[in-house]
């Protein structure tokens, strides 16, 4: 069983919760904490969480997931001391449970540990210790390789470490449409990499934005590449082998959502792991020297992307 090795925060005593106190309400507490985090209601979230807390020898995964949402909410509000406190509780409680059960044996434990590590890393960076943050996430990436949180950890590692570094070469197992440009063909170009999924509505909304950018800036040297991967299913969640999914992408999917002729689409699972794509779309902007200038999980508007691209074209 993988154990996290580098975490050492002696100032915080672990606060634990009774499983009996959470019977029938844990899942609803997780949902409530999530809603409050996104709403920016940090003080209310803390009051709700602490009102449910009682002493026990062992936390439940559900409780720790709720704690991790408290940490995320505090980080959204940039209340870093509070974020560190609850992220540490989520991590240390998760590590205690990992002595007795695998990480992916149920759905709440990966949420608790993954979010705890994410928040703690960004807290360290916000407090001015980026090296500590990168080391934390690098060790976690190694320790939890092959688990459901691997890509999430990689995403947050790259958020803190990829910008300003050379863009790694993509793998191409298969491709859609025209052959993707080779590394040599991309030299001297400004390249926007658009990591997407066929099931992703945000990706479909992003495509017209990319089309507009291509039309505006292609003659100045902008290239757009759209990596994707096999997901194991086709329309409506129907299970599919890679061969069946590729046929679907080239057939029924392309008939409804044509693959743009201006965007090469390499297909490889390793690209999504290597670039930490747990959010689709993920956008990576690379300058003419092959250096990453922006790593952005999530979509961006035409105006936001144009403001990033135009200085690189000068």
Model-based region annotation:
Residues 189-190, 205-229:
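Conserved helix-turn-beta segment immediately C-terminal to the redox Cys motif
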Residues 130-173, 184-187, 251:
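N-proximal helix/coil linker or "cap" segments that precede and/or mark the start of modular domains
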Residues 174, 223-225, 240-280, 286:
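Short, internal strand/loop/helix patches
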Residues 280, 284-314:
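Thiol-/selenol-based redox modules, centered on thioredoxin-like
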Residues 195-212, 233:
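Conserved redox-active cysteine motifs that mediate thiol-disulfide chemistry
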Residues 53-62, 93-110:
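Flexible helix-coil transition and linker loops at the boundaries of alpha-helical arrays
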């Amino acid at each position: 069983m993988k154990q996290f090795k580098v975490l050492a925060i002696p100032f915080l005593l672990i606060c634990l919760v009774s499983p009996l106190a959470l019977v029938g309400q844990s899942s609803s507490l997780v949902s409530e904490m999530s809603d409050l985090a996104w709403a920016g209601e940090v003080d209310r979230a803390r009051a709700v969480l602490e009102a449910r807390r009682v002493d026990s020898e062992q936390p439940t995964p559900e409780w720790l997931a709720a704690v991790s949402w408290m940490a995320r909410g505090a980080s959204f509000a940039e209340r870093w001391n509070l974020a560190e406190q609850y992220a540490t509780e989520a991590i240390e409680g998760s590590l205690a449970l990992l002595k007795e059960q695998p990480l992916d044996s149920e759905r709440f434990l990966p949420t608790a540990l993954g979010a705890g590590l994410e928040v703690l890393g960004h807290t360290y960076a916000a407090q001015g210790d980026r090296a500590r943050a990168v080391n934390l996430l690098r060790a976690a990436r190694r320790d939890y390789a092959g688990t459901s949180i691997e890509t999430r950890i990689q995403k947050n590692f790259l958020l803190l470490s990829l910008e300003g570094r050379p863009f790694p070469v993509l793998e191409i197992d298969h491709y859609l449409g025209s052959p993707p440009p080779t590394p040599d063909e991309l030299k001297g170009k400004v390249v926007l990499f658009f990591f997407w999924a066929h099931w992703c509505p945000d990706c479909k909304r992003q495509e017209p934005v990319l089309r507009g950018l291509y039309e505006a800036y292609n003659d100045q040297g902008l290239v757009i590449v759209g990596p994707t991967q096999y997901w194991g299913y086709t329309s409506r969640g129907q299970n599919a082998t890679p061969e069946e999914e590729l046929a679907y992408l080239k057939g029924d999917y392309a008939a409804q959502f044509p693959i743009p002729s201006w965007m090469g689409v390499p297909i490889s699972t390793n690209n999504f792991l290597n670039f930490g794509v747990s959010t689709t779309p993920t956008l990576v902007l690379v300058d003419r020297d092959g250096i990453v200038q922006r790593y952005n999980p999530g979509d961006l508007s035409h105006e936001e992307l144009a403001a990033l691209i135009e200085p690189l074209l000068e």
